[in-house]
Amino acid sequence: MKTILMAALTLVSYATYAHAQDAAAGEKVFVQCRACHLVGDKAKNGVGPLLNGLFGRKSGTIEGYTYSDANKNSGIVWDEAVFAEYIQNPRAKIPGTKMIYAGLKDEQRIKDLTAFLKQFDASGKKAQ
């Protein structure tokens, strides 16, 4: 009985670990985002807006970036669930968005990307 319990706990622990967010893996996912977006203390708007302090921010509000009316008027406040839905299919979530990315479909990669982005506050400072 003790062996079965230990095996079950090991499986549960592994399953939790396998589905955890991994910021280091998310940084690798972000490589494809860098064509348009930046993060960090030297980040600036480019083809897309900078992504510092994304979570908790209202869509379409980064100063100095020209958003589509769709983004500005979406009423979206970015959180993990909204971001996950958006990044899977940006044009379905916000019809009329300027973002041309086809979408990231892999749930684990979305979680990892989220963990990476959440490290950066609005000033671009990376949490330790």
Region spans (language model):
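Sec-dependent signal peptide recognition
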Residues: 1-7
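Sec/Tat signal peptide C-region and signal peptidase I cleavage site
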Residues: 14-22
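Periplasmic/extracellular electron-transfer cofactor-ligation site
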Residues: 21-66, 72-77, 88-95, 120-128
